[in-house]
């Protein structure tokens, strides 16, 4: 079991989880499940948050996948925790925004020269996968 001991990251995690829980799409997930879902990216500092009035209103995380992990992710929509920083293929995993979604999109396009992503509906059915990256 892995935990975060950095107080700043722990505070971020609490606010990020609250952001997720503010969307019906994530109601079926416990706070613990969401914690473990975003833990690898936070531990590796592969995330960005935007705050308003000292509260997280937008969150994005990404993984650097190797070729095999990328193939697996495209096929299964999942990859192992050890794959989060296994290669040179940047994938944006989650973008969750109450406000400032456009600001987050601009930041991602500025931070990465190219990145890949998958888009899902509210039932987590993936309907669009980037082919060449942005």
Segment roles from a protein language model:
Residues 31-35, 108-109:
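Short amphipathic alpha-helical segment that frequently serves as the phosphate-/nucleotide-binding helix
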Residues 2-3, 52-55, 131:
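Asparagine-rich low-complexity intrinsically disordered tracts
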Residues 68-134:
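Acyl-donor binding region in acyl/amide transferases
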Residues 36-52, 58, 63-69:
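A short helix-loop-beta-strand connector motif used in the catalytic cores of GNAT acetyltransferases and
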Residues 20, 38-42, 111-119:
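Hydrophobic, Leu/Ile/Phe/Ala-enriched alpha-helical segments that form helix-helix packing faces
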Residues 1-33:
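Short amphipathic alpha-helix that is part of the acyltransferase structural core
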Residues 1-5, 60-62, 124:
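Generic structural motif
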Residues 21-27, 34-38, 65-74, 98-99:
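Short linear motifs at secondary-structure transitions and domain/linker junctions
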């Amino acid at each position: 079991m892995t935990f975060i001991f950095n107080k700043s990251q722990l505070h971020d995690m609490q606010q990020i989880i609250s952001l997720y829980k503010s969307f019906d799409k994530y109601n079926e997930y416990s706070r613990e499940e969401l914690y473990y879902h975003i833990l690898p990216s936070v531990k590796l500092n592969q995330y960005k948050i935007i705050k308003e009035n000292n509260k997280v209103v937008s969150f994005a995380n990404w993984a650097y996948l190797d070729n095999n992990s990328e193939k697996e992710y495209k096929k299964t929509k999942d990859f192992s925790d050890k794959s989060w920083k296994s290669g040179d293929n940047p994938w944006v995993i989650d973008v969750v925004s109450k406000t400032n979604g456009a600001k987050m999109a601009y930041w991602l396009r500025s931070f990465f020269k190219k990145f890949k992503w998958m888009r899902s509906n509210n039932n987590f059915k993936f309907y669009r996968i980037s082919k060449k990256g942005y």
